[in-house]
Amino acid sequence: MVRAVVATLLVVLVVASCVSAQLNFSPGWGKRAAAGGEGTGMHPPAGAVVPPPSSLAGESCGTIPVTTVMHIYRLIRAEATRLVQCQDEEYLG
């Protein structure tokens, strides 16, 4: 009887150590819609299609400097490197 309890506890601990999860919460989560069903005005109702602002539509954006794009690329690459290092430390440690 004691061995069965210990074995079950050991299996639960091994499974729990192998499982990882991530929770994401949005700012509008859990809030009820306004009386008109339009939401709070801060966020569109779920499933609603929001057209882009006129300043973003079409060709009015202009060109983006290459230096800006390269800076963003370097930031993303640095963060990806940090994530890989953290994952390696987690798996090895």
From Swiss-Prot:
This is Red pigment-concentrating hormone. Residues 33-93 form a propeptide. InterPro entries: Adipokinetic_hormone_CS, AKH/RPCH_hormone. Pfam families: Adipokin_hormo (PF06377). Keywords: Amidation, Cleavage on pair of basic residues, Hormone, Pigment, Pyrrolidone carboxylic acid, Secreted, Signal. Belongs to the AKH/HRTH/RPCH family. Residues 34-56 are annotated as: Disordered. GO terms for cellular component: extracellular region. It comes from the Eukaryota. It comes from Penaeus monodon. Its main location: secreted. It is found in: Secreted.
